[in-house]
């Protein structure tokens, strides 16, 4: 069989071999089935968290769609590190590393088994960019399908997310709640399957997938346990076969306009700073030029129009009921912020998707154009002698634009968390956590334990936090991450001492360590760096290959050529 371009399917290199067919036969794959488009169905099911717990069920529905459309589905799984469960532990250092491992493992399966197309089912934070990176690297017809957001928990009339539990720990330490209330929040926060419910990293990236065009429009917003998930999963499988037959390649969709639309989607919803890292990485794999200044340029002109947690009031399921991303797209098109002609993997343009939006009467999640929640987007990129290569500050959910104070330095996250719990963080402090970068960790941990404890202790309006690590999408407050160069690579963050004055000014986009250059040079000459004790095995391999956070913390040096569009050596069926 061939695609519409007349070229033989890639899979015939495998399925044309008698030996391969013999080994497929016990699995139920006949000659007739093997002659169809072979579509890999990748997922990350595991029992290590609720985010991906529905993946096997979704994979079954996707496979039904593939078979109904005349294709043959091949299900396989890969890993997932659950961010929320490993948060605050050494295990969290594996999270960002897993993005690369997932990408690599999908590439290995697709290239080795010569799949003609791919559906990548994603859920927890790093699985989403990993799926997109794999498709961009392979340039193989396919799509990304998000398994969906968890429903909110409820306690005393309030919607809960997992961040509610993290912040309740800080509130307990501050004497604001008792242990019984913490336990009640803990037991109510996560009512079922699905990824974390606010506009944290998973939902931020799930939105970005639709604006990049890699996910069918409207599919990702459907909550994890919604009955429509069956329908959208089957449709995704059918679409994958069509993409193979029409030879629609990811890089034809992943244009510069698509990346700009994705940036707008994340800054206009107050999304996770992790999107900066991930979009840089996806663009790298797709061969699309993208840099930190693009995020600044777009965020500066993009107001926040979605009132979503952690900076706002609502969760992802509320956005779905309000009218979904199609409604947000209508707002963004009307405001002239996005490229309406950018095309989705389902064949429609963003303008066509937005035109079909149905706004729920009385909804308050997506605000009117003349009532933005903030005049500029939810992040800013700032530079200075503390971050010559740049760093990211989250602006959603607060109005602070500057901070000056003495440094309080910690060599790792655990020491800082204990200091917060012990009440050793004071008003005006600039909390500095270093040795948590891509190399220094290794793995660039998220700091939700610390940031949530600061919020829970009532300090978020009075301190700043600066780190060469990352923040969870659930973080809010005056927090600065991705400081580059990191401490382990000789960055100035490694030279800061307790009491050093630090000034942060969003208006001028500057972060300044107010110490004479001669003193900094003396400290630099005396500083000795020691590798992290975690830097062995896969962690050590990552530390040896990872690039700066300012470049997306990628481990490949350049975009790949992509898989061959024709079978390299189509074998005769009689072999």
Locate predicted features:
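Catalytic or ion-coupling anion/metal-binding cores of large enzyme and transporter domains
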Residues: 1-51, 58-79, 84-85, 90-95, ...
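Glycine-rich, N-terminal phosphate-binding loop and its surrounding beta-alpha-beta segment
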Residues: 66, 105-109
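Glycine-rich, highly charged phosphate/nucleotide-binding loops
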Residues: 95-104
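A short, small-residue-rich loop immediately preceding and capping a beta-strand
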Residues: 109-131, 143-146
